[in-house]
A protein has these predicted regions:
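Flexible, glycine-rich beta-alpha linker
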Residues: 100-101, 120-121, 144-162
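Substrate-positioning beta->alpha
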Residues: 128, 145, 156-169, 178-200
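NAD(P)H-binding glycine-rich loop region in Rossmannoid oxidoreductase-like domains
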Residues: 41-73
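C-terminal substrate-binding subdomain of Rossmann-fold SDR/epimerase-dehydratase oxidoreductases
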Residues: 174-175, 179-294
Length: 294
């Protein structure tokens, strides 16, 4: 067993690499903002049993501009990766729960739900990515798609533009917590649960599938209240703004098929983020600008 993480120097990848290494897995990483995984060759890729694809345009704002760049990076490059590998290898790729769109029409969205209404370029690429993956799965390829909830938690490279990470950062260093759309629901996935889930898939040789991954569902208001309790910083409510995601997802499928238990909850994630900012000296990044990929 030999694992390659593409995008291993980013927020999720840097934590996942350390986690898999500590579990005794032979793991290697490639990919940063100056490299292009589309240039990886067949011979290099052939030495890995599992390839975890995290690289790409990773947020709505990274895709807010001409479609060509996020399409190439998120969809075309995935297609090329599949075609440079074979049936002996398993590809695990990062999808997103945003494929369910921005309409709160169900209590919980399952893997069988998907929205084809255009919302933004990011969602367009993720829906297309999942459809392409399902095509390859139907042809016998070993592919696992992971529809992440909003990932939060401490990491060697931490994104401070994500919900809990952002609230904790501003509470600790700017002494305020500012929220909008306090009633909206959001699935949250801790980076620790994410890494444990990927480990489980690798070790159990999980079959091709698409899974929702979320440690829990919560609301903006509930998250802000817990961050406020821990940091003793007041909350400023700026009311509602249009265009915000509002949904919750069902995480049962992987719990059952993967015999998996999510360990983190809202309190433990907030504690973990506080510990990271205060004591781990992480590289703090923001991924909220359009990324031009040629």
């Amino acid at each position: 067993m030999k694992v390659l993480i593409i995008g291993g120097e980013g927020y999720v990848g840097s934590y996942l690499f350390n986690h898999l290494f500590k579990q005794g897995i032979d793991v290697q990483t490639v990919g940063n903002r100056l490299s292009d995984y589309n240039l990886l060759g067949r011979i290099f890729l052939s030495s890995f049993t599992h390839i975890v694809l995290l690289a790409g345009h990773s947020s709505v704002l990274r895709c807010k501009g001409p479609l060509e760049s996020p399409w190439k990076n998120n969809v075309r490059n995935f297609k090329n990766l599949v075609e440079k590998t074979d049936n002996r290898q398993t590809i695990i790729y990062a999808s997103s729960a945003s494929v369910y769109g921005d309409k709160d029409t169900k209590p919980l969205y399952t893997e069988e739900d998907i929205s084809i209404d255009y919302v933004n370029n990011y969602d367009l690429t993720k829906v297309s990515l999942d459809l392409l993956a399902m095509k390859y799965i139907g042809e016998g390829r070993n592919i696992i798609g992971l529809r992440f909830g909003t990932v939060n938690g401490g990491s060697p490279v931490i994104r401070r533009d994500l919900m809990i990470n952002s609230m904790v950062y501003t509470a600790l260093f700017e002494k305020h917590i500012t929220i909008t759309n306090k009633h909206i629901k959001r699935p949250i996935l801790s980076v620790r649960d994410l890494s444990r889930a990927v480990e489980t898939m690798i070790k159990s040789k999980a079959a091709s599938n698409i899974f929702n991954l979320a440690s829990f569902n919560s609301t903006v208001e509930s998250i802000a209240n817990i961050v406020s309790d821990y940091t003793k910083v007041d909350i400023t409510d700026n009311g509602d703004v249009p265009g915000a995601y509002n949904f919750a997802i069902d995480n049962t499928k992987f719990k059952v098929l993967g015999n998996f238990t999510y360990e983190d909850n809202l309190h433990s994630v907030v504690e973990n983020v506080i510990e990271c900012y205060k004591n781990k000296n992480p590289e703090i990044v923001i991924r909220n600008e359009y990324f031009q990929y040629d």
